[in-house]
């Protein structure tokens, strides 16, 4: 089934049907040789201006490099067409063989986006606005909502840690999608710990789980009914849900992997809003591919891309830069960043691992919550064992723990920290670097191994 934005002219409709027939069972019997020849002549006439548009995307002065970029864009266009053909073939086959079809969402998604945006705005209105940080987060969120009135393209959300990027980007995406009738909103994050946290926030502020699909390795939908499992499998294969929450790896696979399952999802990016959290984690060796694909998606496929990070990479000054300078959703203001400076960093010097329990207990004498971040799992396990006898409640976090164990430990840790100071024991968390991956939790003091 062809979805909107997969073709820019109705003349491609019969061509897509012909391609689908050729892909699955040879030339259609109802099409004469003259009709097929006519379709291909029309396709050639339509491709000429498209090739001119692709050539115009190049940012290279050198003709050879410009030709290489254009060839890459043509490859992405071919991938998009193949994705649409595969999706139609697989979806129809699943419907015929199993009698299961994914939910059908309307072409005009604006009422759905507007309804979810109203739900979110109501929840945001209940937020406290007492402290300078509360007011700064509100300013960031309001600025993002105002910026959503702009056209599509590439946007940059560069705000300090703790500035409320998840909610601000969600508010931007819903507002923008409601104005431009975007097909779907795709949220990505580089690490599963960040993704789990963001998914919880997004579900809470959307208020309708039927619109949301999570696609990552932490999921095991074993408690669902068999019919729902088949439905989820189809949604995952095609990314046809209105809101997709996935990893950066899955997004990059969708753009570059040669696997048929990845190619099938590529067409779902058309006309969407893609929010890429912690964009600085894109590997340096992939920046050329990443930038060129962002150019293609934003300029040819009508995709709006939001690059989120507190430490933005300079994607416009590499060998193959972004074609357009990203639009900053929040202007850089030193006063705004100063509000979020809540730490005082001190160099504690050198110490042996065996001496650290004494240092930790000394730090606890002036606070009642402490985080110790170790470089290795072995260091964290060793220190945790030594602190078991201390008069405090001690927690251990490590990437070696299974996801459910780590999630339960984080919940217990958060519950301990939420208790009033007068009613709780002193709390110590000994962790590997896993806790630095965007985990939303606060301590009075932190000891970080160098």
Positions of the model-derived regions?
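Walker A/P-loop
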Residues: 151-173
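SF2 helicase catalytic motif II
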Residues: 249, 262-300
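Conserved RecA-like helicase motor core of SF1/SF2 enzymes
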Residues: 399-403, 424-450
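Inter-Walker segment of RecA-like/P-loop motor cores
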Residues: 208-256
